[in-house]
Amino acid sequence: MSAAEWQTKATELDRKLVKQQNVFIKVKASQTAATHASFVVAYNIAKQSKSFCDGEFVKQCMLDVADQVCPEQRKKFEEVSLSRRTVARRIEAIDEDLTAQLKKRVPSFQLFSLALDESTDIDDTAQLLIFVRGISENFKITEELLSMESMKDTTTGEYIFECVENALHKMQLPWQKMASVTTDGCPSLTGKKVGLLKRLGDRVTEVDCTRELIFLHCIIHQEVLCKSVLDMKHVVDPVVKIVNFIRARGLNHRQFITLLKDCGCDHSDVLYHTAVRWLSLGKVLRRVWDLKTEILLFLEMKGKQTEYPQLRKSEWLSDLAFAIDIFEHMNELNTRLQGKGTFAHEMYSTVKAFQVKLKLFSRQLSQNIITHFPTLETMASQIMSTEKYTNMISALENEFARRFADFQKLAAEFAILSSPFTTDFEKAPDALQLELIDLQCDSTLKEIFQTESIDKFYASLNESKFANLRKMATKLLVLFGSTYICEQTFSTMNINKSKLRSNLTDVHVQSLLRISTSDMQPQFKQLVDNFDRPQMSH
């Protein structure tokens, strides 16, 4: 064979080798894409609190779509593994990835705070949720689920402390950087001698005797508890009894709905009230008020009108009208306080504004002015005296002042944080006075304050020139004003671990909760790379 023939043969063999290599590369790329897709679908299943088995349903839908849109590509869709077992493994891997990302951020935290709350799941197991909010040197805030701890045997303050200590240790969060703890105020968390907060405070002092942990009682929970001082039992009990009579029996309920349709009412039904949800109570009272004429007619049809004489008494109807108005005011406050990532000083400002409104209500009611009580205003001609309403508002005002005492201690610092350019620097702490003067005389910084978010504004301050202002802002911006994120996550837990899915393990529940609440995005490429041999589906 001549040299030229050898060269031709070598070129041909080389071309065949490249062709074979390309086949393997294409197969590998196809498998990698299929694995990536299965991770994305599993992530969305977890994010939306769907069952692991839904992966198989999603795949069947994908194949049906492929058959209609691109039948020649069906094989690629078949390669996407979405069996229940695969979805579970993918979710576990995503959880591990998000946990690792959080762990990488921890060293950058200047300070961190915790939000704690406990509740029971469908199996009657007490679950403790621990959320962490960390703030970095450049004021980047991270708010993530730290841990879900299952408390099978006991929920004492000492045991909960051990759970928190274990969670901090796993994430390598240093005690000396803990700024505050926010709870819903249950006894096991707030005990003065052996409660969790006492143990946490002692531990922080052991590590750094100059530091004092800030303890806050959830603003939203406090606001709800304030309603308990309103003497409304004589209003609520008959309303609940009426609603139960209408809705408890199917025949009564159907007949009432038919009556509403015949009368051409705007509402199609009355609402149930659950004792633990004050928001629902306000809506129930409003609905009963709007349908009081139809309810009276229905009770007469049933021969039950004598059992509910309140519906014909103007004094009781006036009390119902007042209850509706004050509950609507408070429900509006409650709604404004809700939301993830809200700063504590913003929530406190909202509460302070409501306290000022209460003062106005009290003063005006004492003068028989009911402008801000529109439902009560419809009963104006039948109201003999507004004294009892004035007393209720005064009691509510006092209860707000009492329950928000822990936030009141921070009021002066909150004022400086939120209004540094208008605060009186002479009344500020000595360490902040000179910095406030420099700040208030800087027109550039004033413009930044007016255009940027509060965290970005404080991040823009020179570290050496405004060291104390930055330190104060770091401490206050890292606070949890409420345990709303815990309450929201418990709702997600109840969706995931329901009667139909009660066999979910605690590990899987924690994975689902972390994924559904996290602001971080999974590193899909890294997750796929970690799977050396992507599996084909079945």
Predicted segments with their positions:
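Alpha-helical structural modules in large enzymes and assemblies
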Residues: 1-538
